[in-house]
């Protein structure tokens, strides 16, 4: 994980750690001229590691985004940002995207009153995301929300009620709120 953030830069979804400033100097000395292939590969790897996707999942999202009207890159980022695991991370209900995936897989999360155990579930506007009524589920989410450093910088397309452990998807995400720098 740390080798990945040293090589690709900060990946907020993968870990809260940041690469040290000295590691950039080593990469610049080693790198030389970067080919177009290398630049595209690094950007693809950033997407994969940030969102926790396999190669096949990413290719499916690229295919869906290519068929849709509009900019393929923007639509791809919107599709990835509307995944349930990513929305939990953005709401502050999990510290990382892998942590959010675990919450979803362990059936702690309800979408519109139904248990969803698929992290790649595509949320739609006006979806209500809550925790299971079990005490363990509420305690887990409460700890994450209390320790969440980015509580005040919640994206416009999401709202959270920290006392009821409830999040709401208002609309599809605006491209300026995506925390990942993609070339």
Swiss-Prot record:
Provide a GO CC annotation, any one.
chloroplast
List the molecular function annotations (GO) for this entry: rRNA binding; structural constituent of ribosome
UniProt xrefs under Pfam families: Ribosomal_S4, S4
Q: What is its main location?
A: plastid
Locate the transmembrane regions by residue number. Answer: none
Annotated S4 RNA-binding domain ranges read 82-143
One GO BP annotation here?
Answer: ribosomal small subunit biogenesis
What are the alphabetically sorted keywords of the record? Chloroplast, Plastid, Ribonucleoprotein, Ribosomal protein, RNA-binding, rRNA-binding
UniProt cross-references to InterPro entries, sorted A to Z: Ribosomal_uS4, Ribosomal_uS4_bac-type, Ribosomal_uS4_CS, Ribosomal_uS4_N, S4_RNA-bd, S4_RNA-bd_sf
Question: Superkingdom, according to UniProt?
Answer: Eukaryota
Localisation: Plastid, Chloroplast
Relate the protein's function as given in its record: One of the primary rRNA binding proteins, it binds directly to 16S rRNA where it nucleates assembly of the body of the 30S subunit.
Q: Which family does it belong to?
A: Belongs to the universal ribosomal protein uS4 family.
The protein's assembly and partners: Part of the 30S ribosomal subunit. Contacts protein S5. The interaction surface between S4 and S5 is involved in control of translational fidelity.
* PANTHER family registered for this protein in UniProt: 30S 40S RIBOSOMAL PROTEIN, SMALL RIBOSOMAL SUBUNIT PROTEIN US4M
Kindly provide the name given to this protein in its UniProt entry. Small ribosomal subunit protein uS4c
Originating species = Crocosmia sp. (strain Porto Alegre 034)
